[in-house]
């Protein structure tokens, strides 16, 4: 959110270009707090590198008129891909509440977005370990099916650390008649306290064996990073062998861990 922060982000992107990424995704702050700059960032990434960017859009704090105006701006800037999410409650709120004149569900947002060429490609979130607010996996899958039926072109999953969770989720999607590509999302563990906070919020689990290794190395940042990167590399290799359409890395503006994961897989060597 500062000029220095933006330049650090662009530098991270520069370092990842050797791996020929298929796209970048760009979030914005809680409650849409950086919604405007998101469009600037997406435009700048495309200008610098010519790589597609998927801009995140949520229902939080926005009316239908707000969302439609934002989509018009995105289209005018050449942004062709949208990640449509309901969004998390703003800080200080325990549960999501739609604003007057707004939308309450991601499938409604998907339905609002003009899809298909020359409009937008639409991605939606999937939850291998079930969305934290869903009462069970069946309800969560019904919600995902509604998003896909509303016009989503692909599913990008929340982070996970056990590939069997993803494979089970992928099988459940197939049984539900979901045929769009399902892209797994990985976050290499470098900052263990940070990842513990994230997984606690989204109800994702860290396998006990991995957790114990990380806990034992918590006072040694280099060891922690090595463990996390090694685990992510094994995950990515296994997923690619299993035929996923690609892997979406949650870089969080810090490219070093993802770079090491990809290098360990033999990528980026020309």
Regions found by a protein language model. Give the residues of each.
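Active-site beta-loop-alpha junctions enriched in small/polar residues
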Residues: 1, 27-31, 56-62, 87-88, ...
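Active-site mouth loops of central-metabolism enzymes
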Residues: 1-8, 53-65, 121-139, 215-230
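Conserved N-terminal beta1-alpha1 strand-loop-helix module at the mouth
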Residues: 1-26
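Active-site pocket-lining/capping segments in soluble small-molecule metabolic enzymes
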Residues: 100-127, 177-229, 234, 264-270
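Active-site-adjacent beta->alpha loops and helix N-cap segments on the catalytic face
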Residues: 5-7, 32-44, 63-70, 89-113, ...
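Conserved beta-strand positions in the central sheet of alpha/beta enzyme cores
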Residues: 25, 83-84, 156, 248
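Conserved, mostly hydrophobic/aromatic
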Residues: 24, 74, 147, 151, ...
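Active-site/ligand-binding-proximal alpha/beta "capping" segment
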Residues: 111-156, 230-242
